[in-house]
Amino acid sequence: MSGVRPPIMNGPMHPRPLVALLDGRDCTVEMPILKDVATVAFCDAQSTQEIHEKVLNEAVGALMYHTITLTREDLEKFKALRIIVRIGSGFDNIDIKSAGDLGIAVCNVPAASVEETADSTLCHILNLYRRTTWLHQALREGTRVQSVEQIREVASGAARIRGETLGIIGLGRVGQAVALRAKAFGFNVLFYDPYLSDGIERALGLQRVSTLQDLLFHSDCVTLHCGLNEHNHHLINDFTVKQMRQGAFLVNTARGGLVDEKALAQALKEGRIRGAALDVHESEPFSFSQGPLKDAPNLICTPHAAWYSEQASIEMREEAAREIRRAITGRIPDSLKNCVNKDHLTAATHWASMDPAVVHPELNGAAYSRYPPGVVSVAPTGIPAAVEGIVPSAMSLSHGLPPVAHPPHAPSPGQTVKPEADRDHTTDQL
């Protein structure tokens, strides 16, 4: 079934539209951008079961990080939703095809944390080669290192970087940034990316290989920088690990599902992979006490934080809010800057031809209560509240708001839709 949803009504004659931050509670960055066109709610939820009914019924826009997942079943709970903006680049936690079917645009912020993710990737690579983490840990544990023999023992496995071959899987924004940094350290850099047109390897001075097998066979260190989809889940598995060079390193700052952690743990224990560094994991939040990696040696793990800096966080939140603003003040999807399901949305929906009064009877004389301007708290443990600005405590709204009627979804027009691309080069990490 295709969803038929109208444009977002905005202006003095219409109710102030509701926008919700689904899995967070800090709206201080978003408010200056949205306060004159929307009421901003924060839900602080980890699933749609924790999202207040008012948001499910009335929110036209949603902001979200990577800590909540929206399946088709989840998306169908939102009765008025027109746009979701992922505060970050990756959107594998959203069913974008189902969103398109339901008339919901999905956008991301692909560029804000490119530098941070690339820097973190190089940090992991350098850590594996120079064993900084393990040397620090040895001193913390009281190991006394004085003689040359003791240094050799505690630093065993440290290697020279110059002349080593770094293999990059996925040469999107982050992949390119990693390549440029790696060359400065003396790496020979090759990459595998079947979606890029010819010529970029010449522009960047890189070596391109035509198959994943070639990259794995020729790389001393493999680093992942591609989005996650149904085609590349467990791209690194027991079979592909065996195609890697004996004693190679593995780094993943992209998506946890790209690596089969059971296969990786076994390869680390057997020494087929000399060391690995992961910022993303199959199950998050990650814990060393659970899962197949708990006993794996020569492993560095960080908590999906490679993307973060204060500057990057502010930039991506500002851009996400601006995308929501474009949706409210403009036309979906034409006014959007980073809509990742635009083709599917355009083919599957015909909201532009609908009379808004038909789809939203409250705009045609039905009773409707307007939110006061500011931030609305609809956190799981709280009641709806609104304030003029942002303060720790919120003033309660009445629970007696009249219900808003929403029609059933219109039947599918039966058009042939263009399939989504298997991969978007803007989805490198976050």
UniProtKB/Swiss-Prot annotation:
Q: Extract the ranges annotated as region (Interaction with GLIS2 2).
A: 277-349
Here the cross-link named Glycyl lysine isopeptide (Lys-Gly) (interchain with G-Cter in SUMO) sits at K418
Task: Provide a GO biological process annotation.
Answer: regulation of cell cycle
Note describing how the cofactor binds:
Cofactor binding induces a conformational change.
Mutation: A41E; reported impact is: Strongly reduces interaction with E1A
Q: Which UniProt keywords apply?
A: ADP-ribosylation, Cytoplasm, Differentiation, Isopeptide bond, NAD, Nucleus, Oxidoreductase, Phosphoprotein, Repressor, Synapse, Synaptosome, Transcription, Transcription regulation, Ubl conjugation
Write down the required cofactor(s).
Answer: NAD(+)
Q: Give the residue ranges for region: Disordered.
A: 398-430
Q: Which domain of life is it from?
A: Eukaryota
Q: Where is this region: Interaction with GLIS2 1?
A: 1-59
Amino-acid positions noted as binding NAD(+) in the UniProt annotation, renumbered to this chain: 89, 169-174, 193, 226-232, 253-255, 279
**Molecular function terms from GO:** acyltransferase activity; chromatin binding; DNA-binding transcription factor binding; identical protein binding; lncRNA binding; NAD binding; oxidoreductase activity, acting on the CH-OH group of donors, NAD or NADP as acceptor; PDZ domain binding
Q: Which residues form a coiled coil?
A: none
Where's it mainly located?
Answer: cytoplasm
- Gene Ontology terms, cellular component aspect? cytoplasm; extrinsic component of presynaptic endocytic zone membrane; GABA-ergic synapse; glutamatergic synapse; neuron projection; nucleus; presynaptic active zone cytoplasmic component; transcription repressor complex
Q: Which residues form the active site?
A: R255, E284, H304
EC code: 1.1.1.-
Q: Where is the composition biased (Basic and acidic residues)?
A: 419-430
| First-tier enzyme category under EC | oxidoreductase
Query: Entry's InterPro entries?
Result: CtBP, CTBP_dehydrogenase, D-isomer_2_OHA_DH_cat_dom, D-isomer_DH_CS, D-isomer_DH_CS1, D-isomer_DH_NAD-bd, NAD(P)-bd_dom_sf
Positions of the record's site feature: Cleavage: N364, G365, S377, V378, H399, G400
Q: Where in the cell is it found?
A: Cytoplasm; Nucleus; Synapse, Synaptosome
Q: How does this polypeptide assemble, per the annotation?
A: Homo- or heterodimer. Heterodimer with CTBP2. Interacts with ELK3 (via its PXDLS motif). Interacts with RBBP8 (via its PXDLS motif); the interaction is disrupted by binding to adenovirus E1A. Interacts with PNN, MECOM and ZFHX1B. Interacts with ZNF366 (via PXDLS motif). Interaction with SATB1 (non-acetylated form); the interaction stabilizes its attachment to DNA and promotes transcription repression. Interacts with PRDM16; the interaction represses white adipose tissue (WAT)-specific genes expression. Interacts with GLIS2, HIPK2, FOXP1, FOXP2, HDAC4, HDAC5, HDAC9, NRIP1 and WIZ.
Its function?
Answer: Corepressor targeting diverse transcription regulators such as GLIS2 or BCL6. Has dehydrogenase activity. Involved in controlling the equilibrium between tubular and stacked structures in the Golgi complex. Functions in brown adipose tissue (BAT) differentiation.
| Similarity comment text for this entry | Belongs to the D-isomer specific 2-hydroxyacid dehydrogenase family.
Protein known as:
C-terminal-binding protein 1
Native organism: Rattus norvegicus (Rat)
Taxonomic classification: Eukaryota, Metazoa, Chordata, Craniata, Vertebrata
